[in-house]
Regions:
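Structural signature of nuclease core domains in nucleic-acid processing machines
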Residues: 1-130
Length: 130
């Protein structure tokens, strides 16, 4: 329970609550199916197939509409992060967030302006540049 309280005390958790209080939609556990270019999966493929599509499915943990209708994407993680391992942790999930961002922009027809990982292991929000 402490981890959950710490999340809602974080800046990101407060933003989620504020969005909800303003009446903006806060979405959780949104399943999605979309198609992406195969070149997004493997950049080494030849140009002959780079525009081919592959189907991608997943579940977006959370996103919300912030002020000015900006969409903020969140992905919650519980992984162990060794001391000094934060950059590796972020890099491990950067591609996943990229795919989620692309899917969410197709679904909502809005730009996703911020992407975050929230680590319950270290009780920290991490802004991820995509």
């Amino acid at each position: 329970m402490d981890k959950l309280i710490k999340y809602f005390e974080s800046n990101l958790g407060k933003r989620v609550l504020e969005a909800y209080k303003r009446g903006n939609k806060v979405f959780r556990e949104l399943p999605f199916y979309t198609e992406i270019n195969v070149s997004n999966v493997d950049e080494s493929l030849s140009n002959d197939v780079s525009e081919e599509k592959v189907r991608l499915q997943g579940v977006i943990d959370c996103f919300f509409q912030d002020v000015d209708d900006k969409i903020v994407l969140l992905d919650y993680k519980t992984d162990y992060i060794p001391k000094g391992g934060l950059n590796e942790f972020v890099d491990k999930y950067r591609v996943q967030l990229k795919y989620y961002k692309e899917a969410l922009e197709k679904i909502t027809e809005c730009d996703v302006t911020e992407c975050y990982l929230y680590s319950f292991y270290i009780n920290k929000e991490i802004l991820v540049e995509i």
